[in-house]
Amino acid sequence: MKNKKTEQAFWGYLLIMPVFLGLMIFYIIPFFQNFYFSFTEIGIFGGSTWVGLDNYKKIFVDKEFWQSLKNTFKYVIIAVPLGISISTVLAVLLNTKIKFKGLFRTIYFLPVIAMASASGAVWKWIYNKDFGILNFCLSFFGFEHISWLNNPTTSLYAVVVVMIWMKIGYNMIILLAGLQSIPKSLYEAAKIDGASEIRQFFFITLPLLTPSLFFVGIMTLISTFQVFDIIYMMVNKYSIAINESTSVVSLFYRYAFEFNEKGYASALAAILFFIIIMITLLQFHIKKKWVHE
């Protein structure tokens, strides 16, 4: 019996070893390396000099950082609730008896599997001031052509639309799975009691969907805090709107790969990680107050 348990444990550890090694090599070790580098100044040829908290002191008086942090929170505050709301509505509609369910699911999920570079290029064309399809359609209603991505007022919101569009499909599939796990007997009992569809949604569907909503909220929040690729593809770095649309990760990229200030960039990454962890822990703390278990 003891040998059998030992053998089972051996095969268990052996099977999880690839995942563990992947986590160590690509996540855990780089995390501690980044944290160490945030206290150093790294030269062009890789040599590092210990500077202590200088990088962090520089960040807290850097107007660029505060602007990028403000932009990042704007992305989160707008894209997360709006994206989840749209995904929920679509999931509820696709959970009803409608034709071509599979086709609609595929169409809504396509942006998820599309490369960010390709999506960014397509939307950049849609937003183009001179020959973009959006301005072309708006011109029929008497609107003048708008430079969506080069206007400091509109650039951030133009990027938000694309972010929501790219995440809707994934969130919708998760929420749809949550909807299908709700017992139909609850709806049948509610109908017998005379509850309308709206009351069924708010008193049955929404409460029982909260575990899925919580998961989707956490994942969407983290990915939105890390937004970079869409901004990089859509907003020109020489545009007058770049300061109004730059995220913290975009600023990290600029300092790490354009200015070659990798120590400062590592400090930016460490601060963003701390912010994400704190907000995620806060969500887990208040989870019991609204998530159905």
Residue ranges with predicted function:
Residues 4-293:
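A structural signal for multi-pass alpha-helical bundles of membrane permease subunits
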